[in-house]
């Protein structure tokens, strides 16, 4: 009887399936480094995935923060190229690991587990948002909660974004919690002082996860203020803004102390105003990533996304517009709460245009646009509920199994195919084997490389503000290598060529002091150069 009752409400079973897979991924992924870009193993390497290259920058700073109590990268270099709140959360994990004598591999496993539970909590909050949008009917509230929960935790694209290890999961959770909290405002005709302080604190902490959340908050407060009783809401919105600003201002003080500017070094490295040459490329990526998010990443092959998405939206159009009772399903939402959701939509949509105009890092666009899921997933779940509620039970079960099946197909193809994603996972092992700590290694991509090798210094400016000073002082990167006594350069061949080997006069000057390292890095993309006369480790035999 209990089992039959459990099957009627299968959410606990599905949570167990999700957690079982996620914990297997965290505990049984391999330590060490792959020796090639394809390996004979169904489990990934911790140095490669699910935690990714860019997350290892934050993990390095978090590890150093726990060890040395300072926000620094390798060589005790003060840095601003992080998202502060998630770094401090990770630093707590790192401190516990160090206290108990653990190593960096254990630290990575804990970060994965943390983000697995963050996604689970996010699913609960999004489900709670969906419940609040449904008036009165408790059974219907549970159904939309259940659907929202399932399409959140079994969304492989979202799972991979969250377990990548950056601030994304925690950031989405805080935005969702902020959105959920505002739905409580509909119960009060007058917004109270206490609500302003709580909401301001919540949004201030969200700002410490991504500073550009300020754009979203500003958009929401403008919509709220212009709605009605403008004078009262202006005072309330100003109190929210001041509370949030009070929370984030210490971070800006730190950034200014380290760099003399208010923009973190990672922002300077990624920012570049769009021009005509970039226009089509950037907005093509925008289109692909928005489609990917809206189709819940069910389609992995990039070239098929636009075609499949067109078919997907055509089906939606037919169901919701030709069959009016499906379209009207969205009209039954609680009117006042729907109004607040609409404010969030208006606040989030500008992200689609702001990021491609001001930021060149197109590989981050999916992460930048992911806050759209906060309002999209609950609304989609409500629409799916209306679509499926009168269908046979087998049809409803089969529809849910599609999401679960696509999740595990994505997981198998991405994590368990034996394919290495990040060349730096191979390069990190190569550096550790070939260059002891007395060598100082420079690289533009130092996420994985710098986390596992403390003798690596960042050369692209994400973590190292000195690189941005070179442009201000009109100095070359080669000058910086000399000044910092860097003996080894490891990076993709195209980056080395662009920075040091083009044009010919620059190549001649560089090769006068540097030579190719005789041992090849087995990833097929990364090359290594060493000084002809090293500043350090002069007696190391493999160097000569």
Positions of the model-derived regions?
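Membrane-proximal envelope and lipid/glycan-remodeling enzymes
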Residues: 1-544
């Amino acid at each position: 009887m209990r089992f039959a009752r459990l099957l009627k409400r299968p959410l606990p079973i599905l949570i167990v399936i999700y957690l079982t897979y996620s914990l297997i991924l965290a505990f049984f992924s391999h330590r060490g480094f792959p020796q090639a870009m394809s390996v004979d193993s169904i489990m990934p390497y911790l140095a490669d995935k699910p935690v990714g290259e860019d997350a290892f920058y934050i993990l390095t700073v978090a590890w150093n923060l726990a060890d040395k109590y300072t926000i620094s990268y390798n060589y005790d270099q003060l840095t601003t190229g992080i998202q502060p709140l998630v770094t401090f959360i990770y630093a707590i994990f790192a401190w516990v690991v160090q206290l108990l004598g653990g190593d960096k591999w254990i630290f990575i496993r804990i970060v994965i587990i943390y983000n697995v539970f963050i996604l689970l909590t996010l699913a609960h909050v999004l489900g709670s948002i969906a419940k609040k949008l449904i008036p009165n009917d408790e059974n219907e509230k549970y159904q939309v909660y259940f659907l929202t929960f399932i399409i959140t935790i079994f969304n492989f694209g979202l799972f991979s974004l969250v377990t990548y290890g950056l601030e994304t999961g925690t950031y989405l959770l805080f935005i969702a919690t902020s959105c959920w909290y505002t739905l409580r405002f509909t119960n009060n005709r007058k917004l109270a002082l206490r609500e302003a302080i709580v909401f301001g604190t919540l949004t201030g902490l969200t700002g410490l996860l991504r500073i550009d959340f300020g754009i979203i908050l500003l958009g929401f407060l403008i919509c709220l203020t212009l709605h009605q009783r403008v004078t009262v809401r202006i005072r309330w919105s100003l109190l929210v803004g001041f509370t949030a600003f009070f929370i984030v201002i210490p971070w800006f003080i730190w950034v200014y102390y380290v760099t003399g500017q208010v923009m973190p070094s990672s922002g300077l490295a990624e920012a570049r105003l769009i021009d005509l040459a970039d226009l089509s490329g950037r907005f093509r990526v925008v289109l692909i990533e928005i489609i990917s998010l809206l189709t819940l990443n069910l389609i992995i092959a990039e070239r098929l996304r636009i075609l499949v998405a067109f078919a997907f939206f055509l089906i939606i159009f037919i169901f919701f517009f030709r069959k009016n009772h499906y379209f009207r399903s969205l009209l039954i939402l609680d009117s006042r709460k729907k109004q607040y959701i609409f404010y969030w939509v208006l606040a989030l949509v500008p992200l689609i245009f702001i990021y491609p105009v001001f930021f060149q890092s197109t590989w981050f666009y999916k992460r930048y646009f992911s806050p759209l899921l906060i309002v999209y997933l609950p609304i989609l779940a409500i629409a799916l509920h209306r679509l499926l509620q009168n269908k046979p039970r087998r049809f409803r079960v089969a529809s849910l199994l599609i999401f679960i099946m696509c999740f595990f197909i994505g997981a198998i193809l991405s994590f368990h195919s034996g394919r290495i994603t990040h060349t730096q996972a191979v390069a990190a092992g190569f550096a550790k084997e070939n260059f002891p700590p007395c060598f100082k290694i420079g690289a533009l991509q130092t996420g994985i490389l710098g986390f596992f090798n403390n003798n690596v210094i960042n050369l692209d400016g994400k973590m190292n503000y000195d690189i941005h000073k070179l442009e201000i002082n009109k100095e070359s990167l080669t000058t910086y290598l000399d000044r910092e006594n860097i003996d080894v350069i490891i990076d993709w061949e195209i980056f080395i060529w662009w920075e040091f080997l083009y044009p010919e006069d620059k190549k001649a000057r560089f090769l006068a002091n540097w030579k190719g390292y005789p041992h090849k890095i087995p990833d097929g993309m990364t090359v290594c150069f060493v000084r002809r006369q090293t500043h350090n480790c002069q007696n190391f035999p493999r160097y000569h």
